[in-house]
């Protein structure tokens, strides 16, 4: 029971950290955000952090960034389908951007997420190390 409680607290902390960071990034660049972005950010942060736990081999930092950009883009696409297409809330629309998919995601933002994911990976690793007392992170660049 204690392990279940500790995992709940851990993933709640990670979810809130990712959610508020994602929302904060949106507010910095767009001037506003939407609650769906807090949910998307929390999910993304947890999934990015699970890369270290799911893959048994020592994944290079660049590879983690590629996977993270894919994860963020996929989550943003799914949230966009629900929020923008199904619920018609029109929170964002990338249809004017080149290389977009249904106006929900585009190549430019996938590349931006690739770069920003470095900070997410490092934040997750050090949050887990310093606050949650998990293993010390180490990195292989390539």
Regions flagged by a language model, labelled:
Residues 1-142:
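Aromatic-rich, lipid-facing transmembrane alpha helices and their immediate juxtamembrane interface loops
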């Amino acid at each position: 029971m204690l392990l279940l409680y500790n995992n709940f607290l851990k993933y709640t902390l990670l979810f809130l950290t990712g959610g508020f960071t994602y929302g904060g990034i949106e507010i910095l660049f767009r001037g506003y955000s939407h609650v769906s972005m807090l949910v998307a950010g929390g999910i993304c942060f947890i999934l990015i952090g699970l890369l270290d736990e799911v893959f048994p081999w020592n994944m290079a930092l660049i590879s983690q960034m590629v996977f993270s950009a894919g994860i963020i883009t996929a989550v943003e696409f799914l949230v966009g389908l629900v929020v923008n297409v199904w619920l018609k809330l029109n929170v964002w629309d990338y249809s004017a951007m080149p290389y977009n998919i249904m106006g929900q995601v585009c190549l430019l933002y996938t590349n931006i997420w690739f770069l920003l994911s470095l900070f997410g990976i490092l934040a997750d690793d050090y949050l887990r190390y310093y606050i949650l007392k998990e293993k010390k992170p180490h990195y292989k660049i390539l």
